[in-house]
């Protein structure tokens, strides 16, 4: 009986490690997707800026205004998606705090970047700027956000460097 319990505990431990690895891979996938979309949205904003050069919001056609409204909404939705990923990271960090402090520390670094730079807030601000035809400012913010997302991705992708085993 004791041997079976030992095997069961070991299997549960291994299953937990596999689950943790899957969670990390999911975080990498999700942050990579958000970063890729952020870069696409930045390119779209840049094209909007070129197309509307020298015109105020009042001088835009209804279709152009609607196009900017949709672009701003997409940016805001992407901010919400990032918040969802960060919330999942927070939960995982709490679970790992005691049993795997190194992995919890890696997640803390990633979360800290997002919080210190107020990434989701900046993304929402960029969305509002797009809707208000403040495309130059929106572009700068989008570029900064993308750079921070790439930093987060780098930390997550290289987490094995932080491990001692």
Model-derived features: where do they sit?
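Extended alpha-helical rod segments
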Residues: 1-165
